[in-house]
Amino acid sequence: MEGALIVAGGNIDTGKEQILSEFIRQSGGPAASILVAVTASGSHPDDIFEYIATCLEDQGLGPGQCRLLPLYEKNVRDRQGRNLLTGDAPGIAQYLDGISGIWFTGGDQYYVRKAFVREDGSDTKLLARLRALHAEGLCIGGSSAGAAIMSRTMIGGGSNKGVLHRETLFSYEGYDQLCEEDPPCPPLIITGGLGFFPCGVVDQHFDARPRLLRLIEACFMNPSGQRLGFAVSEDTAFCYQAGSLTVLGAGSVYVVDTRQASRVQKGEYRDVGLMALQAGDS
């Protein structure tokens, strides 16, 4: 059976026990072998890996059961001097051998997209292997940027103000320059994610950052035609498996439904559905 997805909204704190314990359970329990992908972080891979490994061990994972995937932004190296740079690097798929779970950390989902997906949009060897393992039962978890990458259509960046005042972009073309400019009103970017979560667009940090408008716009403009959005609050996650979704943690998951919606003008919609789910809700 296809493995579970643990999709967390970032800043896991009081909900840590419930969220990470479920990830460990879905990955096989204390003896699970976990691969940690810190690709989104952009820097300090060893420090971030050690933090995640400690958090998982605190929630019951056996000591030494985590390993680091050395796949980072081009100028980053870990303490061993490693960086495989791309999911097509020779021998990279061997890092997935024997694992029962993988955790994607937060940061910038751009780096994950660039490392795991080829420029033409096809899967790298690493992503193709990861897909096959997930179909066989591998659990995939992630928080913040590690949640954003889960959906087929991904919010790559942007803000509510960007929806109102900037043209929506449908690729990461020119993104590095955009980051250097650091505009106060970044545009909404809608692009392809890794595609593990099949039900709609995922957004995160939802209770702490103003993101409702950008999620509505992303659903409404979704090139795949899916019109549902799943907005995860901080310190909250949902577990998805076999068509069923259950909320974990301290906050809420909001389901945005634009299937019957219409746009009045830019930033104004009619008939948008909004449903709130809390811990234990399915």
Provide a role label for each language-model segment.
Residues M1-A32, V36, A40-E50, L56-P63, ...:
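C-terminal and late-domain segments of enzyme folds
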Residues I6-V7, G101-T105, G141, D203:
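Structural motif
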Residues Y51, P63-I92:
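Functional beta-strand-loop-alpha-helix junction segments that form "active/interaction loops"
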Residues G91, Y95, E119-G137:
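Catalytic-core regions built around general acid/base machinery
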Residues W103-G106, R129, H134-M154:
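Catalytic nucleophile loop
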Residues Q109-D123:
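Glycine/threonine-rich flexible loop motifs
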Residues K114-F116, R152-I155:
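Short acidic, glycine/serine/threonine-rich loops at helix termini
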